[in-house]
């Protein structure tokens, strides 16, 4: 349900990136894909921000956690 705001524009519906690109298996070694779902501080972004479905969010979360344990992605990204 896109509601009109005072500015006169509608909110754009977020698209599930994984479903749109027909990705069957979210590989923990694909850090380029996983970095789309992680904030600049290293935290996993919620569904409401990324627009992924619940099923794909669980896949992404499990892959990010696995990549962190294997030292492919940082737990915390401090600047």
UniProtKB/Swiss-Prot annotation:
What biological-process GO terms show up in the record?
translation
Pfam families found in the cross-reference section:
Ribosomal_S18
Provide the alphabetized UniProt keywords: Ribonucleoprotein, Ribosomal protein, RNA-binding, rRNA-binding
Q: Does the keyword RNA-binding apply?
A: yes
Family matches, as SUPFAM superfamilies: Ribosomal protein S18
GO cellular component terms attached to this protein's record: cytosolic small ribosomal subunit
Recall the GO molecular function terms of this protein's record.
Answer: small ribosomal subunit rRNA binding; structural constituent of ribosome
- NCBIfam families assigned to the protein according to its UniProt record, in alphabetical order: S18
Per UniProt, subunit arrangement is:
Part of the 30S ribosomal subunit. Forms a tight heterodimer with protein bS6.
Describe its function. Binds as a heterodimer with protein bS6 to the central domain of the 16S rRNA, where it helps stabilize the platform of the 30S subunit.
Q: Please give the family membership noted in the entry.
A: Belongs to the bacterial ribosomal protein bS18 family.
Which protein is depicted?
Answer: Small ribosomal subunit protein bS18
Question: Which classification does the entry list for the species?
Answer: Bacteria, Bacillati, Bacillota, Bacilli, Lactobacillales
């Amino acid at each position: 349900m896109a509601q009109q705001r005072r500015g006169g524009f509608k909110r754009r519906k977020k698209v599930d990136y994984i479903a749109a690109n027909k990705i069957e298996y979210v590989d923990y070694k694909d850090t380029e894909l996983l970095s789309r779902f992680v904030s600049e501080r290293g935290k996993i972004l919620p569904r409401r921000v990324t627009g992924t479905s619940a099923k794909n969010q669980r896949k992404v979360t499990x892959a990010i956690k696995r990549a962190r344990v294997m030292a492919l992605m940082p737990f915390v990204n401090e600047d």
